[in-house]
């Protein structure tokens, strides 16, 4: 369930993938610290959240992952090319994140255009 998307993000983002997971778990009312370490508390919280909302945890992680990438693009102009193509379409980061999400949670082209219009 979450193994593939967390690993996929970890390849490029390192411990930020775990921090995104931990922030997602907080949205599921898990009492956890965002420290970027997969320890026993993160594992237990992930298992609990998965039991409570098995159909939503992966999608929620994907949404948080997209938000992380867009925030990174906002803050660091040299990384914008990974979030949005020159033509204004979804870049590799966004496509990879959405690959693990159900389509109904993908950003629509119009919402993506609005969200990234200021990126230049």
Where are these regions (language model features)?
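Short acidic, glycine/serine/threonine-rich helix-capping segments at coil-helix boundaries
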Residues: 2-60
